[in-house]
UniProtKB/Swiss-Prot annotation:
CDD domains hit by this protein: GDPD_like_SMaseD_PLD
GO cellular component: extracellular region
Compartments where located: Secreted
Enzyme class: lyase
Active-site residues, as the UniProt record annotates them: H5, H41
Protein name: Dermonecrotic toxin LlSicTox-alphaIV1ii
Family classification: Belongs to the arthropod phospholipase D family. Class II subfamily.
Keyword list, A-Z: Cytolysis, Dermonecrotic toxin, Disulfide bond, Hemolysis, Lipid degradation, Lipid metabolism, Lyase, Magnesium, Metal-binding, Secreted, Toxin
GO MF annotation list: lyase activity; metal ion binding; phosphoric diester hydrolase activity; toxin activity
Annotated source species: Loxosceles laeta (South American recluse spider)
Cofactor remark from the record: Binds 1 Mg(2+) ion per subunit.
Needed cofactors: Mg(2+)
Reaction catalyzed: an N-(acyl)-sphingosylphosphocholine = an N-(acyl)-sphingosyl-1,3-cyclic phosphate + choline; an N-(acyl)-sphingosylphosphoethanolamine = an N-(acyl)-sphingosyl-1,3-cyclic phosphate + ethanolamine; a 1-acyl-sn-glycero-3-phosphocholine = a 1-acyl-sn-glycero-2,3-cyclic phosphate + choline; a 1-acyl-sn-glycero-3-phosphoethanolamine = a 1-acyl-sn-glycero-2,3-cyclic phosphate + ethanolamine
InterPro entries: PLC-like_Pdiesterase_TIM-brl
């Protein structure tokens, strides 16, 4: 999966798809009560990127639904997966659970349109700290008893993006009521302004490939330097988040990688584990 990074303006969705992305990451900000407000990253962000692009969350989700609904004139089959990078740090601790429930409602009614026939992209709910596991718990439990619980079970996956200890991350999922290997992506990364080694990535890949795994897939962010892309692919990651999807596509076509990797399509299930 080639994940376009920080795609916070509606018009940027097609821009990143045209560059070769098959998935996008969008930042979501919240007020202190846990209500999602804007697609916004803010300062600091990546080098050579504009940090202040934003949209109203409802308007963005509606536009994203159009782009991922077959039969809609705006439909783009390339858009298979969405990573919602949820800026939960400003939510009051006692409102984290309610924030998760509210955002689930926005996905249900603004993205899925209260229907099983709209917004087909798979979704990763990405939370920046294992201490915010109650957001995931609230999101999940919003669908308890719902006619749309099958959509949750089919379409939604999970990620803690704060580079936390992996054993502690496993415990956080248990606290959130999410079982091991239940659509879990593990991210690792840092801004493109600073180099980062692959030590934790290698540990995550080892967990993914082990008999005691809790991780289904591993992705790195934010990567676009040619040598860093090659290093990430050599580490057998499943996804790369990037500002330059065309660079990733170019490396994938090289002899070293063209028979080891393929660009994911909608028919490729993002919850299925592929081991080395």
């Amino acid at each position: 999966w080639i994940m376009g990074h920080m795609v916070n303006k509606i018009e940027q969705i097609n821009e990143f798809l045209d560059l070769g992305a098959n998935s996008i990451e969008v930042d979501i900000t919240f007020d202190n009560l846990g209500y999602a407000e804007y697609t916004y990253h803010g300062f600091p962000c990546d080098c050579k990127r504009w940090c202040t692009n934003q949209e109203n969350v409802k308007e963005y989700l509606n536009a994203l639904s159009d782009i991922t609904t077959p039969g809609n004139p705006k439909f783009r089959k390339e858009q298979t997966l969405v990573v919602f990078d949820l800026k939960t740090g400003g939510i009051d601790a006692n409102r984290m659970y309610e924030g998760g429930k509210d955002f689930a409602g926005k996905i249900l009614f603004d993205y899925w349109k209260g229907s099983e026939n709209a917004g087909r992209a798979y979704i990763i709910i990405s939370v920046p700290s294992i201490d915010h596991y109650k957001f995931m718990k609230g999101f999940r439990e919003r669908f308890d008893g719902s006619a749309f619980k099958d959509l949750l079970l089919e379409k939604v996956g999970w990620d803690f993006s704060g580079n936390d200890d992996l054993d502690a991350t496993r415990t956080a999922y248990q606290n959130a009521g999410i079982e091991a290997l239940n659509h879990i992506w593990q991210s690792d990364g840092i801004t493109n302004c600073i180099p980062r080694g692959l030590g934790r990535v290698n540990k995550a890949v080892s967990n993914r490939d082990s008999s005691d795994a809790f991780i289904n897939k591993v992705y790195v962010w934010t990567v676009e330097k040619y040598s860093s892309v090659k290093d990430a692919l050599s580490a057998d990651v499943d996804g790369i988040m990037t500002n330059h999807p065309n660079v990733i596509n170019g490396v994938l076509k090289e002899d070293e990688f063209k028979d080891r990797f393929k660009l994911a399509t909608y028919e490729d299930n993002p919850w299925t584990t592929f081991k080395r």
